[in-house]
């Protein structure tokens, strides 16, 4: 992994209080029995991990004993834990132990044939954890999830934790980490049953898994995890926060989030004054100011502030896309991308703008949209001062100054500043047109093309000219039209000086000087400078007249001929002479008339 993870670093001590989660009485009532048991196990695991790293909060005393065997029963009964003497000279401190004791007193411990004990092993500090005996019965053969220790119904987890200075190793995976956060956030390889990122989700790859989910063909040992996975595939988020509107698929995530509203933020950044409820969050935030990026990618050398972001980045190199859509089979490297994609199938847009009524499938999109109304553009270019509403727009813009084009087409070598533009370009080579109109079946290579095309069916023309009130279905068409009023012709021919409203018109004109006519008719051999001209010419041979007037049924080979013809029925005369006020139905008529005044 990253060099920063392999290099020996100074140990940073974290107290158990920093990772403990508290519930109020009201919140506790919302949890079912399985969730309470799960909460207890997680707290015990976190406590054991803290202890396995040496002193539980960093206090070291050479005269104190080591925490070799701590009984949860003793903690829950308010007694000081017993400890055997060891050369490690670490001790349970006065901070961590009371925190765990308070938590255990809150939990309703269910009577069972097995005793509830937590052990911290000898020199290798094996991680021993208590559990319910019925969990053991779920495994019929192979290596068990927990190992029974004599008469005590305590079980050993199938992984080892070593003291700081030695690598943390998963026996099944064989992957080493020199930082606790790296271990806790490690995405376990497919040899482990569930590839989740926290220790409490680890499972040995043997034994029966009775609950099967037909959508993704995955199986689970616990029904609660099975239900949670179903929500992940369906996109269901039934738990909604009444404070901010954020929704969650799991009650545990919802409860953690609710505590964030009422949590005291005691850890303040000395640089900007921003405060955090946890010291670990403050440490991560401070890297924004220091510029520290301790996690390096071994493939490309790119560095990151958080190990979780590094793990996500590495999927770029491995090509791993573990999150698959059950509707269309499309897969994604991040779960957030899959969640966004699902809205394309459901077409749900729950986030509506109170100003204009426009709706969005994600709250972040609504937040960005608000800046259209407020005019806030917080991201400014240091080169030219141009400001943007989104950081990604600024990044794309800065490439105009640097000339950076990191995305290269493997077919023709053409490079682009944005990955999305490269993807669109590659469809020129593949011929892919993935966006199909449900009305007429016409296909497009870009979603924007389909979106504009749909307006032809709905007759929607949202872009109106402020000069003549003529409306258009596309903004680009409106911009082009406005040059009729302004007289602006920004595209000038370098050979003859003739100027044009559109760049495409200039390109077509330049073929007059070069005499280039690459498009030849295979019927009569006549050649043209433009492909569109050849297409129109072929209709002479085929007799095709695709543009028909709905009023009289007359048909035409060109669309502009049909538009001109329609003025016969409407009586419209949009072209007016500025000299005498005479109007015409066609621009050519106005041009001929102007010669009268010139003469």
Swiss-Prot record:
This protein's record includes keyword Repeat: yes
Superkingdom of this protein's organism: Eukaryota
UniProt-listed Pfam families: KRAB (PF01352), zf-C2H2 (PF00096)
Residue span of region Disordered: 68-88
SMART domains: KRAB, ZnF_C2H2
Cell compartment(s), UniProt: Nucleus
Record-level GO cellular component terms: nucleus
InterPro entries the UniProt entry points to: KRAB, KRAB_dom_sf, Znf_C2H2_sf, Znf_C2H2_type
All copies of domain KRAB, residue ranges: 14-94
PROSITE patterns: KRAB, ZINC_FINGER_C2H2_1, ZINC_FINGER_C2H2_2
Main location: nucleus
Keyword list, A-Z: DNA-binding, Metal-binding, Nucleus, Repeat, Transcription, Transcription regulation, Zinc, Zinc-finger
Annotated GO MF terms: DNA-binding transcription factor activity, RNA polymerase II-specific; RNA polymerase II cis-regulatory region sequence-specific DNA binding; zinc ion binding
GO biological processes: regulation of transcription by RNA polymerase II
Disulfide bonds: none
ZnF endpoints (C2H2-type): 239-261, 267-289, 295-317, 323-345, 351-373, 379-401, 407-429, 435-457, 463-485, 491-513, 519-541, 547-569, 575-597
Family of this protein: Belongs to the krueppel C2H2-type zinc-finger protein family.
Function noted in UniProt: May be involved in transcriptional regulation.
PANTHER family per record: ZINC FINGER PROTEIN, ZINC FINGER PROTEIN 819
Protein name: Zinc finger protein 530
Organism in which the protein naturally occurs: Homo sapiens (Human)
